[in-house]
């Protein structure tokens, strides 16, 4: 074999390796896209949302089919963080609410809830999640109403506030409750 033959053979080998690698990358990209589409479809089934943009927004906020059941609890988590930290009473009530909604201990949704109770989510998460909840409620696919969610938030606000039961809801919590009630009911914020 001449040097030219060796170089040509090496060139063909490198070219074949390149295209095999590109094929694998393309197949993997297609698998990821199919998995993401499947995840969005599952979240759509669980939330009643069908608009692809809303489902992508859910995904962009980090929700998965395993954690999307937490979406209606996000406003209550926002209220719990109103005064800069989550109290033991608020944590206990939020955990109890999660359990009544089928979120079992040790599941991805439970771990996400724990993370949100330990570290305050970004304000953007609260704003976008509230908008998504309003869209979810407008589908009529859920028994829950905006009023139900606001009452849940009020229960969280009252969970650990006030000495001797006086002023159980702080000014910060009251402000968030007013804003959430308006937003969830599709009214302009006061």
Residue ranges and their predicted role:
Residues 2-79, 85-190:
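Small-residue-enriched hydrophobic alpha-helices in membranes
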């Amino acid at each position: 074999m001449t040097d030219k033959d060796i170089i040509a053979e090496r060139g063909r080998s490198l070219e074949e390796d390149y295209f095999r690698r590109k094929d694998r990358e393309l197949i993997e990209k297609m698998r990821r896209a199919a998995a993401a589409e499947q995840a969005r479809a599952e979240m759509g089934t669980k939330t009643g949302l069908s608009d692809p943009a809303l489902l992508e927004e859910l995904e962009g906020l980090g929700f998965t089919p395993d954690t999307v059941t937490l979406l209606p609890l996000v406003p209550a988590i926002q209220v719990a963080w109103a005064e800069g930290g989550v109290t033991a009473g608020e944590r206990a009530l939020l955990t109890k609410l999660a359990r009544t909604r089928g979120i079992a201990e040790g599941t991805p949704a439970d771990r996400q809830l724990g993370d949100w109770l330990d570290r305050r989510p970004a304000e953007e998460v609260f704003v976008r999640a509230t908008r998504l909840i309003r869209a979810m409620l407008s589908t009529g696919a859920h028994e829950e109403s905006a009023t139900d969610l606001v009452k849940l938030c009020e229960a969280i606000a009252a969970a650990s506030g006030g000495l001797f039961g006086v002023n159980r809801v702080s000014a910060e919590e009251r402000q968030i409750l007013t804003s959430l009630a308006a937003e969830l009911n599709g009214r302009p914020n006061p």
